[in-house]
Amino acid sequence: MVKCTPLLALTVIVSAGSDALSDPTVKRLAKLATINQAPATQSNSDSKRVLRASDVPDEVAAGESRSPKSLWPWEVEDKLAPLKEKLISTSADDLEAGGSANKNALPMIWRWLWQNQIETKKTPIDEISKEVQTAMDLISSQATHEELNKAGVSVSDYVKALRFTLSDIDVVNRGMEYNIHLGNK
């Protein structure tokens, strides 16, 4: 099977003419070329990540622009790698946990990150819930994690409140801290 390289895809597109961009086959070639030229990142075990066609959103393969707030899965993992390492190496006392709770936390935190959709656009101010408004008020008053917990602020609402003023990666940082504080290890 011939590997679709960026050069091969470009050659096919150019030879097919200017109308080729609307052709499904050409879109597929562009998608494969995108996958093959995407920089491989390395995991903790120094093994290269294998990018699949499903990793590339259809709208990106079709040439449509993506939101600057949107992160590809491997971009998110690259940004979170230092946080994950810190979590693993943090002492049990610092996490108010014990034993192997540190490593057991990682799958749960990963699910939580995607459930809260860090790439989602900010919610319009007039559509926020009472719970999120409460979280926003507490955050603006520099409330501690204990005070947030006593007020019944959930991690999800806390993250939504943070999203109004912070960048995505800072939301992840603070959201993870609160998540760990609540004992979700």
Curated annotation (Swiss-Prot):
Residues 1-20 form the signal peptide. It comes from the Eukaryota. Its main location: secreted. A motif (RxLR-dEER) lies at residues 49-66. GO terms for cellular component: extracellular region; host cell. Keywords: Secreted, Signal, Virulence. It is found in: Secreted; Host cell. Coiled coil: none annotated. The RxLR-dEER motif acts to carry the protein into the host cell cytoplasm through binding to cell surface phosphatidylinositol-3-phosphate. Belongs to the RxLR effector family. This is Avirulence protein ATR39-1. It comes from Hyaloperonospora arabidopsidis (strain Emoy2).
